[in-house]
Amino acid sequence: MNARLPLLAVLALLARAARPPGQYAQRVVVKDGAHIHVIPLDRLDYAQAQDDYVALRTEGKTLLKSQTLGGLEASLDPSLFVRVHRSYIVRLDRIRALEPYGKNDHVAILADGTRVPVSREGYVRLRELLE
């Protein structure tokens, strides 16, 4: 195992390995004041870490959920969602293109035109999954 992986990433990997196949979340519930939003995961474009919260982007709206990105990642089906950066998880079928950005960096262009940064490790992972 890579010694550079932070503890939360290792715990997320262990949680995924322990989860039986087909036992991934189908939706995310977000409390927004007095409102409760139920987001089916087939409508989730991406998630972005924001301290101890995660910003969920769906259908042109962004909702904040009190959860870490690692916690969310552990509940998602890895065949549908991929962590492309320490701060981003993206739904694979929303990615339309990968473009170079600067000397050694890349960005993922999503179906709605959003540009999401992709780390070097995320780029390698994406290339494997998209081929």
Model regions: which residues?
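Short, basic/aromatic-enriched C-terminal tail that caps enzymatic domains
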Residues: 119-130
